[in-house]
Amino acid sequence: SLMFVFILGCNSSTQNYLSEEKKVGGLTDSVEILRDEWGINHIYANNQKDLFFAQGYAAAQDRLFQFEIWRRQSTGTVAEILGPDELARDIGTRLFQFRGDITTELNHYHPEGKEIIESYVQGVNSYIKEILKTPEQLPLPFKMLGISPQLWTPEVVISRHQGLLGNIGQELQIGRAVALIGAEKVKELLWFHPQDPEINLDKEIDKAILFEDILAPYFAYRKTVRFKEEHLKESFRKKESMAFLNLYNDLSEDSLDLGSNNWVVAGNKTADGNTYMANDPHRTIAVPSLRYMAHLVAPGWNVIGGGEPEIPGISIGHNEFGAWGLTVFRTDGEDLYQYEINPKNALQYKHNGVWKDFTVIEEIIPVKGGAPEKVRLYYSHHGPVTYRNEQKNIAYAVRCAWLEPGGSPYLASLRMDQAQTWEQFQEACTYSNIPGENMIWADKKGNIGWQAVGIAPIRSNHSGLVPVPANGKYEWNDYLPIIQKPNALNPEKGFIATANQN
């Protein structure tokens, strides 16, 4: 059905209000979007479906090029617009795509996650269809590259290509260092705290192979999209154009390792007796921003704050009852496994003394300026295979906790957005698998709290800090319930602070 969307904007210098009425297919009732003097959308809807439809519509309208780059990163179609240099990225993206049950996945993030995410996608697509009717109005970067935005699916929203805060590269580096100088010397040079982890390499590990590029697909798909002069249409190939377009180079950069900070203070420590929450998550300064501010209002919803532009809901913010923020709480959710390939059948690998078949998926990747590339993706029962050496009959695969349902970064914030009490907020936190975070809470009833989140494998036989052979000795024993991670409620000292800055 076609309903009205009201969009109002305010020019702060003249105090003139502009209004626009639009008929938008896909809404079930009228929606009002008030755009304030800072460009923040305050969305008022009469039901949940329309609320998230409108969030998707408005966010796509504001960040269309950012949305299209995200979509291509998440679907493994960057080479289609930038050429063969991006083929490795697209292969890696497809290798690490979530391939589980999509309904289970969507409903992890909220009891009505499927409805919310599908409504959001419908809103995004509604705006894309609208702008494609007048392509001359597309933002300039589309014209510079000679491309058009394409439609979204829920699979685009739940992409794992960004914000993972993985540590598998460090595990490989530690393994290489141990191979060169031994575990004790590595412990002297690196700072392992507060425990003394086991980092000796299993005798089955081929030390020479560790120095091969065994994580190439993993690193390729997580790198930033970089634009070059040859990517542009000839009429735009000049210095000014490149300077403009390269503002977008940091779209997927994530500088959280620089150190984020947050704190909550109880009312007995403040002049007015209220609880306070403050948060400064350190992210790359980019144009457009890596955050997107919005205010979402509908029955059961009244939340304002910042979130990832391409996902529904609010990641950091407040509702009528409380406020929350986050910093990184690093959690090791990845392990690197070495396999023996069957010398008589390269489609098999040995696990725990038994030959098993690799799962093989064939994909066709479009490539600008060339023929489509047909690739084969291999999977062991642990996960994506990143390296195969059929001369030495060795393969490596990554087991990733974030390929379980619920591994899309920040999306479980949807549950936090409706929390009315500390207990409800803490329950919402138990669904927050990725990334590992220190979630803090302050509410109007005077409570302050902290809950560490992030999916954490239980390892009984190894530290997870070096590559291990797939001989059955180094398996995960389920996941630690998030509620058992560090937490606190109303500590006697009257405040809680978390920080990543030494």
Walk through the language-model features, giving the residues of each:
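Targeting-peptide/extracellular-domain and disordered-appendage signature
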Residues: L377-L411, F425, I434
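Short helix/loop capping segments that flank catalytic or ligand/cofactor-binding pockets
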Residues: Y44, F52-A54, R160-H161, G273-N274, ...
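Substrate-recognition/specificity elements adjacent to catalytic centers across diverse enzyme folds
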Residues: Q15-Y276, P281-T284
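C-terminal motif of bacterial Sec signal peptides marking the signal peptidase cleavage site
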Residues: I7-G9
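Hydrophobic alpha-helical segments
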Residues: P312, I394, I434-N502
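Compact, glycine/acidic-enriched structural inserts
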Residues: N302-P372, M416
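NTP-handling and nucleic-acid-processing catalytic cores
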Residues: M242-L336
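Alpha/propeptide regions of enzymes that mature by internal proteolysis
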Residues: I33, P409-Y431
